[in-house]
UniProtKB/Swiss-Prot annotation:
Role of this protein: One of the primary rRNA binding proteins, it binds directly to 16S rRNA where it nucleates assembly of the head domain of the 30S subunit. Is located at the subunit interface close to the decoding center, probably blocks exit of the E-site tRNA.
Organism: Chlamydia abortus (strain DSM 27085 / S26/3)
Stated name of the protein: Small ribosomal subunit protein uS7
SUPFAM superfamilies named among the record's database cross-references: Ribosomal protein S7
Domain of life, per lineage: Bacteria
Entry's family note: Belongs to the universal ribosomal protein uS7 family.
Gene label: rpsG
GO CC list: small ribosomal subunit
Length: 157
């Protein structure tokens, strides 16, 4: 266990167009090789496409709802007890919940074949908004794993 103080959380400024810290964190996750202006362009264009497909007046609220639908509530953590490793279901912390949802959305958007990141991201956000698609399947699989290993819940730490 480290004797040093805990690392301070870095405060991220809100994005310039929508004024949302969550959206700025999402842009940072989309960003590759430090190219933030490209990441911003991709995310903003994807949000416009997403808003048109969903028919939402407030883009930010629709984005937040799509993100909320993708957030996992439970996950499994490996715990070694007496030579055996158990998959112990635990609740996901709020920060990690956001982080996982964003990572999954971006991962599956990049995996869409023959489409630009802009189109893939918009499609994945629409799927999350409608509670379907690869991201929601990943969330359900995570919940299913936690449910299947409920017997080991008493090993929580």
């Amino acid at each position: 266990m480290s004797r040093r103080h805990a690392a301070e959380k870095k405060i991220i400024p809100a994005d310039p167009i929508y004024g949302s810290v969550t959206l700025e964190r999402f842009i940072n996750k989309v960003m590759m090789h430090g190219k933030k202006s490209i990441a911003r362009k991709i995310v903003y264009n994807a949000l416009e496409r997403f808003a048109k497909k969903v028919g939402a007046e407030n883009v930010l609220e629709a984005f937040e709802e799509a993100l909320e639908n993708a957030k996992p509530l439970l996950e499994v953590r490996s715990r070694r007890v007496g030579g055996a490793t158990y998959q112990v279901p635990v609740e996901v912390a709020a920060g990690r919940r956001d982080c996982l949802a964003m990572q999954w959305i971006i991962k599956f958007a990049r995996a869409k074949p023959g489409k630009s990141m802009e189109v893939g991201l918009a499609t994945e956000l629409v799927d999350c908004f409608n509670k379907q698609g690869a991201t929601i399947k990943k969330r359900e699989d995570t919940h299913r794993m936690a449910e299947a290993n409920k017997a080991f819940a008493h090993y929580k730490w």
